[in-house]
């Protein structure tokens, strides 16, 4: 556990790997992206399709399905990750197509904003149903196809899965759960050749905050996200997570250095809290030695 926490310090960069593009001599690898209508999911869908991969794009509304179907290399699938019937139908559609399935991007998600003391249990339950049980349901249903292709499962987490802040309690809980989901599933599926990883975005432009406010009537500093960058870098990280030859377990993607530093410093604070005043605490020299050992296993950090 200590070595793992120390190794989180290494997550501020993408590394130098390049995703392998499909060649004309082979059928394009197929990937399912959930929550593909807007935001990160839409950027991931468009990026992968443009690179020549075949994308099954999950969405719920007719207009969104039509817009996704208009993109070359994309087949829209009606998919609400809280509905088992939708999941079963998606699995049947993908199986019948005969392309197999190489990748799953668990992207569909909702945010819940506001104090825990006044948030309804129904709102907390919705957050868990979409952000936690949704990926669990879908991943379980698609495992036979992913194992057959020795594919990859990439979940869109958040830096809120590393730290937590005021008014994002339920959302942060759900994203912390996805960190554990990723690590446990990676260990379970490694013997079958399936790689599991997680992309952890910081603050990027999306509709997730506005959707939460519209649903709950609670407006917070997270509601308007239009001032943030488009999630182009997040989509690039997802492509690497899916296709680079030696993928990382975690891809932290922040819009600027300040946010990256804040996240890593918070992780260091947690490490200090974990170590302090317990029977088997380590002194500074021992902690630095652990960090040095962890750094030796990581590729060199490329500075722009």
Residue positions per predicted region:
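Rossmann-fold cofactor-recognition segment
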Residues: 72-85
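Substrate-binding pocket helix/loop in short-chain dehydrogenase/reductase
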Residues: 115-116, 123-125
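Active-site helix of classical SDR
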Residues: 139, 174
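Residue(s) in the substrate-gating loop at a strand-loop-helix junction
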Residues: 158
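Active-site-adjacent segment of SDR/Rossmann-fold oxidoreductases
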Residues: 163, 184-194
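SDR active-site lid
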Residues: 191-248
């Amino acid at each position: 556990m200590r070595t793992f926490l120390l190794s989180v310090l290494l997550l501020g960069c993408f590394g130098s790997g390049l995703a392998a593009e499909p060649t004309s001599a082979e059928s394009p690898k197929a990937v399912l992206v959930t929550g593909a209508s807007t935001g990160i999911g839409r950027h991931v869908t468009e990026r992968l399709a443009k690179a020549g991969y075949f994308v099954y794009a999950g969405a719920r509304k007719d207009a969104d399905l039509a817009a996704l179907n208009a993109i070359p290399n994309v087949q829209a699938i009606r998919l609400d990750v809280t509905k088992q019937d939708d999941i079963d139908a998606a699995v049947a559609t993908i199986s019948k197509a005969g392309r197999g399935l190489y990748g799953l991007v668990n992207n569909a998600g909702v945010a819940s904003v506001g104090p825990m003391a006044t948030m309804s249990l129904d709102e907390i339950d919705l957050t868990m149903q979409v952000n936690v049980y949704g990926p669990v349901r879908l991943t379980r249903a698609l495992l036979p196809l992913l194992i057959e292709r020795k594919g990859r499962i990439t979940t869109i987490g958040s830096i809120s899965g590393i730290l937590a802040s005021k008014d994002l309690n339920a959302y942060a809980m759900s994203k912390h759960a996805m960190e554990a989901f990723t690590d446990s599933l990676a260990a379970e599926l490694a013997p079958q050749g399936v790689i599991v990883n997680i992309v952890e975005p910081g603050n990027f432009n999306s509709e997730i905050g506005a959707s939460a406010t519209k649903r709950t009537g609670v407006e917070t500093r997270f509601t308007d996200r239009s001032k943030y960058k488009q999630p182009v870098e997040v989509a690039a990280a997802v492509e690497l997570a899916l296709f680079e030859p030696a993928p990382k377990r975690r891809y932290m993607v922040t819009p600027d250095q300040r946010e990256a530093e804040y996240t890593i410093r918070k992780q260091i604070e947690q490490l200090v809290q974990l170590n302090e005043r317990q029977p088997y605490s380590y002194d500074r020299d021992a902690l630095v030695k652990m960090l040095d050992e962890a750094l030796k296993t990581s590729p060199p950090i490329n500075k722009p």
